[in-house]
């Protein structure tokens, strides 16, 4: 008898729940069927610089070590062009600008001498991503991205111990979710960017007459850049 009551209750509740779900308003139901659509994004990013010290001593016996102890925040803005390839696949191109700063701490192990350098950057970025989306659930749809990003730093340079090359290339992996609002689609996204190149400038003729600075430069083997990007897309 109890089993029959449970079954009867389920039969009464499930159709009502299904009807309630069907009654929910689907915002922009045909938004994902467009072949091409445009948008823009704003957000912030965290920059990191992985420095590899070679441990070599200078001619006067000093050992300098450099590091970036923490991620540094910055601002980013992009435009977006999205090409629909399939129900679950989109190709996205989102050129833009990333503005940021990295602080390098340098220390001589024997004497305890320290020095800092602020590296300001203004990147022109050219990201290309493959967006892989799941199924839409009412007004939301999760997705992941995989792609690459070329960057060109247009900031001014000075004769400092660390001078970075202006170009770099990143492998990118991201995760986000589309939220379908009445008048546009809103997508919060987090992306992890892994630099593939050694961006440290090793040939430094500008430091020929600055031996104290050259000692720090020569103590570094390579430098690679990483970023975490938090973006809000409006499409």
Predicted regions and their residues:
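Residues on the lipid-exposed face of transmembrane beta-strands in outer-membrane beta-barrel proteins
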Residues: 40-44, 75-83, 95-97, 126-134, ...
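Short glycine/proline- and aromatic-enriched beta-strand/turn motifs that initiate or cap beta-hairpins
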Residues: 18-72, 233-235
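Membrane-spanning beta-strand positions in outer-membrane beta-barrel proteins
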Residues: 37-39, 90, 129, 139-143, ...
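Flexible, solvent-exposed loop segments that connect beta-strands
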Residues: 52-68, 100-121, 154-164, 200-220
């Amino acid at each position: 008898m109890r089993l029959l009551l449970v079954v009867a209750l389920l039969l009464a509740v499930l159709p009502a729940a299904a009807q309630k779900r069907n009654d929910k308003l689907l915002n922009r139901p045909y938004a994902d069927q467009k072949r091409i659509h445009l948008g823009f994004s704003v957000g912030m990013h965290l920059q990191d610089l992985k420095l590899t010290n070679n441990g070599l001593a200078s001619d006067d016996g000093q050992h300098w070590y450099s590091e970036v102890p923490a991620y540094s925040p910055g601002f980013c803005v992009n435009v977006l062009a999205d090409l629909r390839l399939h129900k679950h696949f989109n190709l996205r191109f989102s050129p833009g600008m990333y503005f940021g700063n990295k602080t390098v701490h340098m220390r001589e192990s024997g004497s305890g001498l320290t020095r800092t350098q602020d590296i300001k950057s203004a990147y022109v970025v050219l990201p290309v991503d493959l967006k892989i989306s799941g199924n839409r659930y009412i007004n939301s749809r999760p997705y992941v991205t995989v792609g690459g990003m070329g960057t060109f730093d247009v900031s001014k340079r000075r004769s400092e111990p660390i001078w970075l090359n202006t170009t770099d290339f990143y492998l990118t992996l991201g995760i986000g979710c589309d939220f379908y609002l009445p008048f546009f689609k809103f997508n919060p996204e987090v992306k992890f960017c892994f630099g593939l190149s050694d961006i440290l400038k090793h040939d430094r003729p500008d430091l020929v007459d600055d031996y104290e600075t050259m000692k720090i430069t020569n103590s570094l083997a390579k430098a690679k850049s990483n970023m975490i990007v938090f973006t809000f897309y409006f499409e």
